[in-house]
Amino acid sequence: MLLSCSIFRLFCIILLLQLGSIYTKDFTALCSTCRQLVDDFDKGLEKTAKQNFGGGNTAWEERKLSKYETSEIRLTEILEGLCQSSNFECSHMLEENEEHLEAWWFKRKTKHPDLFKWFCIETIKVCCPKGSFGPDCNTCIGGADRPCHGNGKCDGDGTRAGNGKCSCDEGYDGEFCLDCSDGYFNSLRNDTFFLCKECHESCVGCSGGTNQHCKECRNGWVKDQEGSCIDINECIKDPAPCSDDQYCLNTDGSFSCKACDIRCTGCKGDGASSCLNCADGYKDEEGTCTDIDECTEDPASCSDNQHCLNTDGSFSCEEKVPAFNSEGAKTGDSPEKHEDL
């Protein structure tokens, strides 16, 4: 019996948590829908503000336009253009609250020109003023003007949802977003602002923005005699960090190994001009490894009954095959096949 009661209580708690989640999501969506509805209403106002009767009588048009400006006809035109047919949430909100919009149009507009504030916040109460949250529109941490002290986002800000907790921007931490995250330091603090800036890339923790303000150095950096974190040049270490067919490229805090050019046997950098020695099939010409044209060498690289074809770093020999004309007379030789050497 006790076990059954415990299970029932647990079920109730889970159900309440789920309902709370749905409630929050509903109010966030409702506020968004209301905001969109008001935005569309404002667009309708702009669109209908320039109605042209085209009668040619300016005085007559001014009288008609003056009447049209606050008329039921104009309101109807605006309402008909509010919600797209596929937007069920907007259509449902409009259907339930059309009388409120009519009341604002005919009785409240002059005294309450801000439709969003009057309709979404004060009348149907699905939104809150900026800088407040929740069912009672409580003020966010840090105040309505600068929620989370301007360094984060207040949960539920501007809606009847949320718990008001701060989600701090990058570089900021703490319940009130008044602390700097790891890797950042406080560069400005007064009654109005609290500013965090990123540490120098060489630092693990810092008190300022240069490599002289590091508490510790990151891997790949080391402190010099003056206490500044400087890059370690891994490329000058012995033994070398890269293989014989690679060259070392030092970077800030690290290094990388790059493949040598195909014309090189060992290298100290990129390209054929950085070779330590030239690979087979290449020769050094004024400090750059270039292709050897084996087909021009003496003695010849191919036999007398072969054609020589030079390639980059190598060559091939093609067998000569007798060629004949249409009358059967021999006209010369043509290549038959390739033999890579």
Curated annotation (Swiss-Prot):
Belongs to the CRELD family. SMART domains: EGF_CA (SM00179), FU (SM00261). Glycans are attached at residue 190. It comes from Danio rerio. Disulfide bonds join 140-154, 148-166, 168-177. It is found in: Secreted; Endoplasmic reticulum. Possible role in neuronal acetylcholine receptor transport. Residues 1-24 form the signal peptide. This is Cysteine-rich with EGF-like domain protein 2. InterPro entries: DUF3456, EGF-like_Ca-bd_dom, EGF-like_dom, EGF_Ca-bd_CS, Furin_repeat, Growth_fac_rcpt_cys_sf, LE_dom, NOTCH1_EGF-like. It comes from the Eukaryota. FU repeats lie at residues 193-248, 254-308. GO terms for cellular component: endoplasmic reticulum; extracellular region. GO terms for molecular function: calcium ion binding. Keywords: Calcium, Disulfide bond, EGF-like domain, Endoplasmic reticulum, Glycoprotein, Repeat, Secreted, Signal. Residues 136-178, 291-317 form the EGF-like domain.
